[in-house]
């Protein structure tokens, strides 16, 4: 799993939580450029993506691209999970993508990951190489 989060402490806490669940974290990317590079290098089976990242693109746009190019599913994490406009945008670009609210609830995180592991890639996404 790849974590894309620009808040260092939150990323480290999430990494520790995932590792305690037995999930291997292949890297932490604090920005979009690092997220793309790590995805190309590590080919993660899942990405935890912060919605709001520094740069010309946000987490939603890059998640869509990662899915199209690598077929990797994305779980979004945001402090704005109650923002209807944001949720509509996410679900329009990536139908069915889970959105978790910060701070993360461990049991909800675990259930979401288990659910994604059992789903086929969204239609229109290329299969992973």
Regions found by a protein language model. Give the residues of each.
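Hydrophobic/aromatic residues positioned on beta-strands within the core alpha/beta folds
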Residues: 77-79
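Conserved acidic carboxylate
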Residues: 5
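Active-site beta3 strand of CheY-like receiver
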Residues: 42-49, 53
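Short amphipathic alpha-helix used as the core "switch/output" element in two-component signaling
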Residues: 60-69, 88-92
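Short hydrophobic/Thr-rich beta-strand motif most characteristic of the beta2 strand and flanking loop
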Residues: 22-30, 38
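Acidic catalytic/metal-coordinating carboxylates
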Residues: 31, 57-61
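Charged docking surfaces used in two-component/phosphorelay signaling
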Residues: 12-20
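C-terminal output helix
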Residues: 101-116, 121-126
